């Protein structure tokens, strides 16, 4: 599992990284 800290808060912004959709 990748680090969740790579994702944006709430996964609303694409700038959080490629893992954003994974965390959602």
UniProtKB/Swiss-Prot annotation:
Q: Which GO terms describe its biological process?
A: defense response to bacterium; killing of cells of another organism
Residues bearing PTM 4-hydroxyproline: 14
Q: Which residues carry this modification: 3,4-dihydroxyproline?
A: 14
What Gene Ontology molecular function terms does this protein carry? signaling receptor binding
Chain positions found as 6'-chlorotryptophan? 4
The record's keywords, sorted A to Z, are: Antibiotic, Antimicrobial, Bacteriocin, D-amino acid, Hydroxylation, Lantibiotic, Thioether bond
Q: Which residues carry this modification: (E)-2,3-didehydrobutyrine?
A: 2
The keyword NADP is assigned to this record:
no
S-(2-aminovinyl)-D-cysteine (Ser-Cys), cross-linked positions:
21-24
Entry-annotated residues carrying 2,3-didehydroalanine (Ser): 5
The UniProt record lists the keyword Coiled coil = no
Here the cross-link named Lanthionine (Ser-Cys) sits at 3-7, 13-20, 18-23
For this protein, what post-translational modification is recorded in UniProt? Maturation of lantibiotics involves the enzymatic conversion of Thr, and Ser into dehydrated AA and the formation of thioether bonds with cysteine. The C-terminal lanthionine undergoes decarboxylation. This is followed by membrane translocation and cleavage of the modified precursor. Occurs in 2 forms, A1 contains 3,4-dihydroxyproline at Pro-14, A2 contains 4-hydroxyproline at Pro-14. The patent report does not provide the stereochemistry of the modified prolines.
Record location of the Beta-methyllanthionine (Thr-Cys) cross-link? 8-11
Q: So what does this one do?
A: Lanthionine-containing peptide antibiotic (lantibiotic) active on Gram-positive bacteria. The bactericidal activity of lantibiotics is based on depolarization of energized bacterial cytoplasmic membranes, initiated by the formation of aqueous transmembrane pores.
Similarity field: Belongs to the type A lantibiotic family.
Q: What is the name of the protein in this document?
A: Lantibiotic 107891
Q: Can you name the source organism?
A: Microbispora sp. (strain 107891)
């Amino acid at each position: 599992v990748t680090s969740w800290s790579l994702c944006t808060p709430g996964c609303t912004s694409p700038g959080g990284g490629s893992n954003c959709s994974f965390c959602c």
